[in-house]
């Protein structure tokens, strides 16, 4: 009987992951690409339904991932070295879960084999977002959906 081999996200640290393994932790929810507002009083971060101009509102994929920083200079590129800063990511985020030593959820494509499960389970905001090009920044506060952390 062969020994069970744990999945890479369980048996490796973030620093041990290959580039392909690291990128595959992304569940494709697109929540990290939503505009966020910070409460000046307590520094809480709130997610809005307002998506980055490059985010496809249905697939939740960046329309120009390779060149995104040229169009969106403040686009955050997640790296394993930032794991201690991942608290702002949603609690369902693969990067955050693995950085906290937790397993991936059953709907994650690495577990179930279906990249659309994140949408079927309504983890993503697919079909429920607005492009930042269509909402004045002064109105973003009207579109808060949840508090980070």
Swiss-Prot record:
Extent of the signal sequence: none
Classification via PANTHER family: UPF0260 PROTEIN YCGN
Protein name: UPF0260 protein PSPPH_1551
Cross-referenced InterPro entries: Puta_zinc/iron-chelating_dom, UCP006173
Pfam family, one: CxxCxxCC
UniProt-listed HAMAP family: UPF0260
Superkingdom field: Bacteria
Similarity section: Belongs to the UPF0260 family.
Organism (species): Pseudomonas savastanoi pv. phaseolicola (strain 1448A / Race 6) (Pseudomonas syringae pv. phaseolicola (strain 1448A / Race 6))
């Amino acid at each position: 009987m062969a020994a069970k081999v744990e999945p890479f996200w369980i048996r490796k640290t973030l620093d041990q992951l290959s580039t392909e393994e690291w990128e595959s932790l992304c569940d494709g929810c697109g929540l990290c690409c939503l505009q966020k507002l910070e409460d000046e009083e307590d520094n809480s971060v709130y997610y809005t339904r307002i998506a980055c101009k490059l985010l496809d509102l249905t697939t939740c994929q960046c329309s120009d991932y390779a060149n995104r920083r040229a169009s969106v200079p403040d686009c955050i590129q997640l790296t394993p070295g930032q794991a201690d800063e991942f608290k702002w990511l949603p609690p369902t985020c693969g990067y955050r879960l693995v950085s906290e030593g937790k397993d991936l959820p059953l709907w994650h494509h690495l577990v179930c084999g279906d990249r659309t499960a994140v949408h079927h389970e309504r983890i993503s905001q697919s079909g429920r977002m607005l492009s930042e090009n269509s909402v004045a920044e002064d109105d973003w506060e009207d579109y808060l959906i949840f508090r980070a952390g």
